[in-house]
């Protein structure tokens, strides 16, 4: 349906415009694929699923994005997974690739786990392998997938404002997503890309 109207000085209005667009896509019986913005775009995208069947959220990211509030902000790029976990139709979260632990305090990790999150680092993912990771995700569920570009290693995706070494390589994520599509249905996909282009 094209771009959502983004008002750079008004996050609330921008989020309302994104939510309206995603609701229109869902009403048409299509799968919303949302590209761009910062990771807060997940908040309105997930809000748009209110009234839909429940889903399991799969996040590929370097950061947990589970801060409840920071400097008075509850709907920014550090909050979307916390806001998602509060929704009754989000049955659980698989947070995969998490490695930049400085972005969320210890209590954020404890809160995430207590609210149904399975947190897996890149090192843990590689040690267990794709199949074992997939086995940790409920089979036959509806999946909402969100990918932050910093989930990838900066050697292949340097154009992020928050590069974090030790990230995923392209084919690791591709194989994981391929396996996920064989376990259940993808009902939404959000990819966060920064404004700067990857360098070569």
Sequence positions of predicted segments:
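Active-site rim beta-loop-alpha module in soluble metabolic enzymes
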Residues: 94-157
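Conserved small/polar residues in nucleotide/adenosyl-binding loops
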Residues: 193-199
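Gly/Ser/Thr-rich active-site loops/lids in small-molecule metabolic enzymes
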Residues: 164-176
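Short glycine-enriched, charge-decorated loop/helix-capping segments at active-site entrances
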Residues: 70-73, 158-166
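Active-site glycine-rich loop that binds ribose-phosphate moieties when present
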Residues: 17, 41, 64-67, 72-85, ...
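Metal-dependent C-N hydrolase catalytic cores
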Residues: 1-56, 103, 119-121, 126-137, ...
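Short beta-strand segments
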Residues: 34-36, 59-61, 95-97, 146-150, ...
């Amino acid at each position: 349906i094209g771009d959502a109207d983004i008002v750079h000085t008004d996050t609330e209005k921008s989020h309302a415009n994104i939510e309206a667009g995603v609701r229109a896509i869902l009403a048409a019986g299509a799968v919303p694929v949302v590209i761009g913005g910062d990771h807060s775009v997940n908040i309105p995208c997930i809000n748009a699923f209110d009234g839909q069947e429940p889903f399991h959220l799969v996040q590929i990211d370097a950061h947990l994005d589970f801060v409840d509030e920071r400097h008075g902000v509850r709907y920014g790029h550090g909050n979307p997974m916390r806001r998602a976990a509060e929704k009754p139709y989000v049955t659980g979260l698989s947070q995969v690739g998490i490695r930049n632990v400085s972005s969320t305090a210890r209590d954020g990790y404890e809160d995430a786990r207590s609210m149904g999150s399975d947190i897996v680092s890149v090192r843990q993912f590689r040690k267990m392998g794709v199949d074992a990771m997939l086995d940790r995700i409920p089979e036959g569920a509806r999946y909402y997938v969100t990918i932050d570009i910093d989930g990838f290693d900066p050697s292949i995706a340097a154009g992020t404002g928050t590069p974090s070494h030790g990230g995923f390589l392209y084919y690791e994520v591709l194989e994981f997503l391929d396996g996920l599509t064989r376990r259940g249905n993808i009902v939404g996909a959000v990819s966060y890309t920064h404004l700067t282009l990857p360098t070569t």
